Amino acid sequence: MSLEDRAKATGKNIEGKAQEALGNVTGDPEDKAEGKAKQAESEVRHGVEDVKDNVKKKID
């Protein structure tokens, strides 16, 4: 996985955690939901890149 892709996914996770926390503090369910969605997107991105890494290792 490229370092850039991993950094983007990690950034998205941090952004999601911050947004979810803001939603918890303000009581805004939309912020909470969007924050959780960003975290889920980050997990999917990491998973896809991990699969790419594993395939590349097997090919090499």
Curated annotation (Swiss-Prot):
Pfam families per the UniProt record, alphabetical = CsbD
Q: Where is the composition biased (Basic and acidic residues)?
A: 1-18, 29-60
| Region annotated Disordered, chain positions | 1-60
Q: Which InterPro entries match?
A: CsbD, YjbJ_sf
Entry similarity comment: Belongs to the UPF0337 (CsbD) family.
Q: What is this protein called?
A: UPF0337 protein asr1134
